[in-house]
């Protein structure tokens, strides 16, 4: 059958938050779970999640030498919007990488860490990586903590091992609520991201919106119906 080609996208940061992805990329459904071996997860100098190859993987696999994420089927239109949200090419670059994939609902991966009950299928996926700021050890931005915690909640429900969350993600992301002011900023960022690190030129977003990729419509960042679901989650109403 013909049709527009679609990619598999591996999200490992705040795009673990299903509601955020549904507003940023409304035509790109969540398909399942992914594991990227031989890589490490960290917060870089921008204050956001990044991954890099593990320098010397140990013979016995550890949580710190693999990255877990959620997998989405990405349309070309949503990919263009995601590029803007990810600050391509200034903040992140795009790569096609082999990721182990479990289809949603298979129930082969759980919080007990029994990840090898059934091997996943190896698939090529789109991954966003910051190759310039490739070191960890930095604090996450406060609003990013909010979005990551929502993503962690969804990731655990979808089968990301709790041990990975505890040993890797929780090393950077505290399980705590932020102030209402910070939560409101997180709400805006979830609807349509605006870089606060100074890495992405301000004009890039303006040019992209002018070319027809309207973040306010796609993400609901203007305070309309598109962001309602996100606001409800942050306020605890939904």
For each predicted feature, which ranges?
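Glycine-aromatic micro-motifs
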Residues: 2-238
């Amino acid at each position: 059958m013909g049709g527009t080609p679609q990619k598999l996208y591996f999200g490992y940061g705040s795009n673990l938050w299903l509601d955020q992805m549904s507003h940023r990329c409304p035509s790109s459904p969540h398909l399942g779970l992914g594991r990227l071996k031989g890589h490490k997860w960290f917060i870089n100098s921008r204050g956001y999640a990044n991954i890099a190859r593990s320098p010397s993987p140990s013979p016995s696999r550890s949580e710190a030498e693999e990255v877990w994420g959620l997998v989405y089927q990405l349309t070309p239109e949503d990919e263009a919007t995601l590029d803007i949200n990810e600050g391509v090419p200034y903040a992140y670059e795009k790569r096609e990488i082999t990721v182990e994939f479990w289809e949603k609902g298979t129930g082969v991966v759980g919080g007990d860490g029994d990840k090898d009950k059934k091997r996943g299928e190896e698939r090529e996926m789109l991954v966003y990586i910051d190759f310039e700021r490739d070191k960890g050890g930095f604090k996450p931005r406060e609003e990013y903590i909010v979005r990551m915690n929502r993503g962690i909640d969804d990731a655990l429900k979808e089968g990301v091992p709790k041990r990975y969350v505890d040993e890797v993600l929780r090393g950077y992301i505290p399980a705590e609520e932020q102030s209402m002011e910070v939560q409101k900023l997180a709400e805006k960022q979830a609807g349509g991201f605006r870089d606060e690190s100074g890495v992405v030129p301000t004009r890039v977003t303006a040019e992209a919106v002018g070319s027809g990729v309207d973040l306010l419509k796609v993400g609901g960042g203007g305070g309309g119906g598109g962001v309602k679901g996100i606001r409800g989650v942050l306020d605890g109403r939904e």
